[in-house]
């Protein structure tokens, strides 16, 4: 029986710290961030769908949010100011992220990989869904900053 270490590798998310360059009241793991982003993404999509009548898939976006930073298991968390410093650097990091997502997908059986690749790459999402996921990601960061501001670490 062949072993597929995909889930074992994703289990490492709980040990990968985010926000390495910022003070924090407590360390936030990649696992916590992805759960927060998934909850926020699902809620934003439900609002978009039910109130504004958009054709988005809340469940698909929520699952994609669970994997949206999975490549950081292999790459680490690059600070946002560095990631967006210049277009060549941003493009290079996007290529590194895409390669890491491909590497993660390769840890699955072929039959499963076909259904997972779109979540790992974000390719399963429409442009509107991608925007909502990005908004959820940013809301998660804003909430983290608000909590930091109101904590003893501020």
Descriptions of predicted regions:
Residues 2-20:
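Short alpha-helical hairpin
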Residues 39-45, 59-78, 134, 138-141:
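Active-site alpha-helical segments that house and flank conserved acidic catalytic motifs
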Residues 25-59:
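Alpha-helical phosphate/pyrophosphate-handling elements in metalloenzyme active cores
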Residues 2, 59-63, 109-147:
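Histidine/acidic-rich helix-loop-helix segments that form or flank divalent-metal centers
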Residues 40-42, 95-124:
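Histidine- and acidic-residue-rich, metal-dependent catalytic cores
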Residues 75-87:
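Aspartate-rich (DDxxD/NDxxD/DxxxD) Mg2+/diphosphate-binding motifs
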Residues 149-154:
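Conserved small/polar residues in nucleotide/adenosyl-binding loops
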Residues 85-99:
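Divalent-cation-assisted or electrostatically stabilized phosphate/pyrophosphate-binding catalytic cores
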